[in-house]
From Swiss-Prot:
Protein known as: Protein Vpr
Post-translational modification: Phosphorylated on several residues by host. These phosphorylations regulate VPR activity for the nuclear import of the HIV-1 pre-integration complex.
Note: HIV-1 lineages are divided in three main groups, M (for Major), O (for Outlier), and N (for New, or Non-M, Non-O). The vast majority of strains found worldwide belong to the group M. Group O seems to be endemic to and largely confined to Cameroon and neighboring countries in West Central Africa, where these viruses represent a small minority of HIV-1 strains. The group N is represented by a limited number of isolates from Cameroonian persons. The group M is further subdivided in 9 clades or subtypes (A to D, F to H, J and K).
InterPro entries documented for this protein: RetroV_VpR/X
An annotated GO cellular component: host cell nucleus
Source organism, top-level taxon: Viruses
Record's keyword terms, sorted: Activator, AIDS, Apoptosis, Cell cycle, Host G2/M cell cycle arrest by virus, Host nucleus, Host-virus interaction, Ion channel, Ion transport, Modulation of host cell cycle by virus, Phosphoprotein, Transcription, Transcription regulation, Transport, Viral penetration into host nucleus, Virion, Virus entry into host cell
Subunit-level organization: Homooligomer, may form homodimer. Interacts with p6-gag region of the Pr55 Gag precursor protein through a (Leu-X-X)4 motif near the C-terminus of the P6gag protein. Interacts with host UNG. May interact with host RAD23A/HHR23A. Interacts with host VPRBP/DCAF1, leading to hijack the CUL4A-RBX1-DDB1-DCAF1/VPRBP complex, mediating ubiquitination of host proteins such as TERT and ZGPAT and arrest of the cell cycle in G2 phase.
GO BP: any one term: protein homooligomerization
Function: During virus replication, may deplete host UNG protein, and incude G2-M cell cycle arrest. Acts by targeting specific host proteins for degradation by the 26S proteasome, through association with the cellular CUL4A-DDB1 E3 ligase complex by direct interaction with host VPRPB/DCAF-1. Cell cycle arrest reportedly occurs within hours of infection and is not blocked by antiviral agents, suggesting that it is initiated by the VPR carried into the virion. Additionally, VPR induces apoptosis in a cell cycle dependent manner suggesting that these two effects are mechanistically linked.
Chain spans, region Homooligomerization: 1-42
Modification sites for Phosphoserine: S79, S94, S96
Organism: Human immunodeficiency virus type 1 group M subtype K (isolate 96CM-MP535)
Length: 96
């Protein structure tokens, strides 16, 4: 009779620890780019909607990821990823 192979892969962190670490990283980054009262209100909204649940945790992670992505994409001045409109010369060319 065949037996299932023993787990020989690398040790992995439990999923909940990893999720909490991701949330902490997102919070640190969000505080650098958004007003604290605004983030506090977002957290209150999530807590009111989901309570103290894993669904609430997943929701706040998803929302913070989306907000930070959009913020960087439209041109955060703290980042090199954003779209910064280039100035054009009088004739419309970008040559010097």
């Amino acid at each position: 009779m065949e037996q299932a192979p023993e787990d020989q892969g690398p040790q992995r962190e439990p999923n909940n620890e990893w999720t909490l670490e991701i949330l902490e990283e997102l919070k640190r980054e969000a505080v650098r780019h958004f007003p604290r009262p605004w983030l506090h209100n977002l957290g209150q909204h999530i807590y009111t909607t989901y309570g103290d649940t894993w669904e609430g945790l997943e929701a706040i992670i998803r929302i913070l990821q989306q907000l930070l992505f959009i913020h960087f994409r439209i041109g955060c001045h703290h980042s090199r990823i954003g779209i910064i409109p280039q100035r054009r010369g009088r004739n419309g060319s970008s040559r010097s």
